[in-house]
Regions:
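Hydrophobic N-terminal alpha-helices or hydrophobic patches in metabolic proteins across all domains
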Residues: 1-118
Length: 118
């Protein structure tokens, strides 16, 4: 998850966020969805609800980051489609179900639908 935040954060920091979209990537020949999220408490970004609402230069920075960070490992990554908030939520749920099937013996059960709020 790439967290858009106006403050610097240490790697592996836990932050309460909401998804705004994802970028489809081809990473080492495999599909890889990069979830983009925003902290609830971030004053710069927390007015954005969907990745499509962000300024264009933010997309350029993210695409550049995702394509060059793998180059340091001698690997190739290609940025693809940009997807909205609802698509990101579907990807997250699929990943949770896959994890539950692999490690918990069954899919995650959704007792109630989350609110449309962030």
């Amino acid at each position: 998850v790439l967290v858009l935040c106006s403050e610097a954060m240490d790697p592996l920091t836990l932050v309460r966020c909401y998804p705004v979209g994802y970028i489809s990537m081809l990473d080492g020949g495999k599909n890889d969805e990069k979830i983009i999220a925003i902290p609830f408490s971030d004053p710069t970004y927390n007015t954005y609800q969907d990745l499509m609402d962000l300024p264009g230069h933010i997309f350029d920075e993210m695409a550049h980051f995702f394509t060059v960070y793998k180059a340091l490992e001698g690997k190739e990554a290609v940025a693809g489609d940009v997807n909205d908030r609802q698509a990101a939520i579907r990807v997250i749920r699929q990943a949770m179900d896959h994890y539950a099937e692999c490690f918990l013996g069954g899919p995650v059960r959704q007792e109630s639908q989350p609110s449309s709020d962030r």
